[in-house]
Structure formats: structure tokens, C-alpha cells
Amino acid sequence: MRNKYCILILLTVLSLSWKQKNNMKSNERIVYALDVTIPGRYEAYINDILVETNNEMSMHNTIININQAVLKSGTYQFRIKLFSSNEELRKGGIQPDTFQFLKVGLVKYQKIAVGEGAEEGTYQYLYSYPIPNLEKPVPYYEIKGKFTIDLPYELNGWSNGQDLRKWDKDTLKKKVIAYYKKLWEILNKGDVDQWQKLVKKSQEEIAFFNYSDKEYLNKYIKEEKEEIIKDKGMMAALEDYEMKIYADGRLVCLERSNHTKQVNGIDWDIKGESPLIQYGKEGGAATFPVKLYLPQ
């Protein structure tokens, strides 16, 4: 079990809110995404936020949701970083012929009412980003692009957060680590009521941009509570992390800093994942991706 979207938590006041556009239509469930084919390991950033990381050296054909990293309509940027395998590095890096498989496109669709996916006949391929022709191997490569979107809603989210880049780095890191330790203790105790107090508003915003109804949200919350209680006392040690700042200084988090081959009996490289990891009593693990911000 892995959480799909990142939970946003304040370091101080624990509240979030959203505001709808006056012209929002009840039947609009517009999703923007990057439709990608990526050969090898990669990290995907949208609006200066790491939204997806995959450490498997294989061919990835996937959709990267844009809605999760933006708060309203506008023009934004993305970047996708491709990394060499150890074998490729011995040959100088990513080989030029590998780039023939790399594809990145902007898509838009109307989400189905229940679950994930596009309503039939609504999937639009808006733009295909150019891929370079390289003449020699490179240790890594980064493709960047811009896109403009028009969403039927507007969220407050982290928009009023402080620019944490202006903080003393050591002071900020101590504060962030202390807060993660607090979250770790809550999860390890199986204190689902306290956890819900912290994440309720963020879960509501996730449900909102994902066009999920209250029934779906309540079902998700119920299942998460059951998982936390079932694996009470099974939190992995809070270790091997580094602090990362995103969203032009508005968001901060801890991420695992080293590669792994296995986690609690399953093949899983957790570099870049949240260090809040709960082991399953019957094997496997769940991460709790959290980003923090401080209101101005």
C-alpha cells in the first residue's frame, strides 16, 4: 500500500480551505496530465514540486497528474530528470539511441465520475514536446517545458506560505525533523484521531482536485485508519533522510536519500520517498508522503 498523493500539513495552524470559481460547473472534472514514455529511472517535477519518482530501470508508459501540483488556472513549468543506470555509466551515460523512446506530451480529459481514468471520447492530446537528438552519451538528462491550463476551481493550498529559503537552513531543518518525529509517534501509536486532525483538510483538498465525492473520501479515510491501526507499532526508523524545499520555497519535506533493494520483504527502491514508512505485519510497507508549510 502506498499513498498516491502528498499530504500537506502546516507547521503551525492546522487548517486549509478552498474557494470555487463562481462559474464552476458541477459536471466539469477536467484533468491535465503529462502523457510520458520514459526509458529508465526518472524524477518528475511540476510547478517546482517533485510529484513522481521511479527508480526502476525499465520502460515506463504512464500519466503524470498535473492537478495535484497546481492550485489554479495559469501557466506553469515541468521538468523530468532521466538518470543513467550503473551499466550505462560505465559506457559514459545514457546512450543517444535511448532518446528515441522518450516521449512527453500534454493531455487533457474529463475524469470519470467514480474512480480513475478518462470518460470515453474526452482524451485530448494537446501538445508533444520536442526531444533532442544527442550525439554522445550523457550521465543524466533533463527535459523542460511550459503549459497553460484552465481549471474549474481554485485552491488556497500553500499559496500563502512563507518563502522558507529565507530561513536559516539549520533552524528550519531542526523544526522540520521535530515535526516529522511528532508525526512518526502519532502513526506508530496508531493514534488515528490525532492523525485525522492533522490531515483532514488536506485530504479534503486532494478529494476536491481529484473530483471525488464525500462517499469516496470517507471510504478512503476509513481504509487508511484501518491500515494504521492494523500495523500499529510497525513504523520503520526515521532515518536516512535529507531536507528538500519545493514550490519556490513554500513547501518543505524530508525524503529518503539512499537507494534500497528491498523494504520489508518486497522489491522497492525508496530513494526520494517519504521517510514516514509503516511496515505491514504480513510484509510490504506504506509511505506517508508529507509536505509542510508555514503561513505568512
PLM feature spans:
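Juxtamembrane and targeting peptides
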Residues: E120-D168
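Short solvent-exposed beta->alpha transition segments
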Residues: Q196-R250
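Beta-strand-rich ligand-recognition modules
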Residues: S26-R29, T37-F101
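Exposed beta-sheet edge and beta->alpha loop/turn motif
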Residues: D231-Q296
